[in-house]
Amino acid sequence: MAKNRNEIPEKLTWDLTTIYKTDKEWEAELTRIKSELSLVEETDPGHLLDSAESLLTITEKMLSISQQVEKLYVYASMKNDQDTREAKYQEYQSKATALYVKFGEVYAFYEPEFLKISKEVYNKWLGELQKLKNYDHMFERLFAKKAHILSQKEEKLLAAAGEIFESPSETFEIFDNADIKLPMVKNESDEMIQLTHGNYSSLMESKNRGVRKAAYKALYSNYEQYQHTYAKTLQTNVKVHNLNAQIRSYDSARQAALANNFVPEKVYDVLMEAIHQHLPLLHRYIELRKKILGITDLKMYGIYTPLSNLGYKFNYEDGVKKAEEVLAIFGKEYKGKVKAAFEQRWIDVEENIGKRSGAYSGGSYDTNAFMLLNWQETLDDLFTLVHETGHSMHSAFTRENQPYVYGNYPIFLAEIASTTNENILTETLLKESKDDKERFALLNHWLDSFRGTVFRQSQFAEFEQKIHEADAAGEVLTSEYLNSLYGEINEKYYNLAVKGNPEIQYEWARIPHFYYNFYVFQYATGFAAATFLAEKVVHGSTEDRQKYLEYLKAGSSAYPLEVIAKAGVDMESTDYLDAAFELFENRLSELEKLVEKGVHL
């Protein structure tokens, strides 16, 4: 049973006094920054391009205030996350969020004003004022957007329409999470319980086929019933993306979304090409699953059934020890930072009443790279620990080696650092496995992760691309059209006929990622790149490990593909994907051999 916050040993809580010693200090900073923003509002708009010195001064002031706002926000947010019932910290978070909004409003002038400068004048100023070169890559990114920025009047109109453009995704979220009441179903104890989005996953992992089937059919009966409403929200959302792309002179919504993060479209195309080429591997995995479960007719509700009963148990101390041992492979510098994170209270470990669920790595440029966990002593908790430590090490290395302006990194790169660690942990545990049953469990765990991240997220990415293209070509995205398209893609991926799995055609209706605007493909590219890099780190040279650290240290000082190239990955080539699929095939072959030996019985 979860404890109250004050019952958790101090050593298992994060130390937020390293950010602000007291709440009063936070409150004083909030007041001071509000005043500073009011002053900026009166003095800076309209003067950015008065001179090279003015551009430098206003830019540095903006970045400095941004740095302070982030620090304030992080403290309030983490204080709230550790016990969401505390009204004081709910209020702190609201105030910090309002400050973020105010900062955005005050500096709304910056980008449109900067884009009035010609490249000739900018280059002249760059030659005259050496310090401007510290921000050259930031300015270069702004220039890259210039062709897609509208007049000040048009930008103002678009900004005013922002709330309207957000309404399809907000309507979906409210309808799906608040308005819809899912049916009652039986759990493994034969008790009637309320089906929720939260408990659906655990019910789908039940060893009782009847429990899985009932939960699956109950969930999708909801999406079948309301399919026309879900189709309308998704269709409108796609229209918003396509309209924005058209207004800003992009060729497509996909081009607009990827250009925003400076990721070439070729990365997406290369992923799709490699996925389609390697779908027979997923079909092989599905066939093996049938064999292990002893059935010839696998249903979609059998995809998540656990294939192993082996239960790993790790208390937190053992988990930390194992994580330190596994991550030592990166060398002295990385090892030292991991030690600091584990010993200097960067981590909030245990579950307590009111604490935010799940796990994350957080912090700001001026703080430790904190981690929130909810440790339950499972193998998944150990994987979560090395995953979040990967994010935190990425943050720590970036902040130590880059100025604030480049002291962050995009999601496109973020998931690589975390899942590389997960892959190295898998490699280590496989090496240490004592018998075939352990190997079976570990191989199954990794293959399921690969399937769920690389294959499944690519399936979503393919559907997302096709519905945007269809709308742009004048197709009406009715529920019938969406059902048919999704069912066809699902059948192609899993080799399981829609006829025998009619409910799966409605799955598109429950995926929130389809409202995120070409976001989901990054999970697949990230996991594949991490698989490729983990092999280089484990089996490669000291130079390979050093190159990996260079990627962690680069932050956003270069474009994403240039940064990951430092580690040795070319995201516009299929090489990294082919290497990842080769490992998937090798591990699948090993699992097949273990099944032949009867290890699963």
UniProtKB/Swiss-Prot annotation:
A single GO molecular-function term is:
metalloendopeptidase activity
The cross-references to CDD domains, in alphabetical order and at most eight, read: M3B_PepF
Locate the residues binding Zn(2+): 387, 391, 394
In terms of Pfam families, this protein maps to: Peptidase_M3, Peptidase_M3_N
- Provide the GO biological process annotations: peptide metabolic process; proteolysis
Q: Which InterPro entries match?
A: OligopepF_N_dom (IPR013647), OligoPept_F_C (IPR042088), Pept_M3A_M3B (IPR045090), Pept_M3A_M3B_dom (IPR001567), Peptidase_M3B (IPR004438)
At the top of the EC hierarchy, this enzyme's class is hydrolase
Q: Does the keyword Metal-binding apply?
A: yes
Keyword field? Hydrolase, Metal-binding, Metalloprotease, Plasmid, Protease, Zinc
Cofactor binding note of this UniProt entry:
Binds 1 zinc ion.
Q: Which cofactor does it need?
A: Zn(2+)
Family listed:
Belongs to the peptidase M3B family.
Its recorded name reads Oligoendopeptidase F, plasmid
Gene (name only) = pepF1
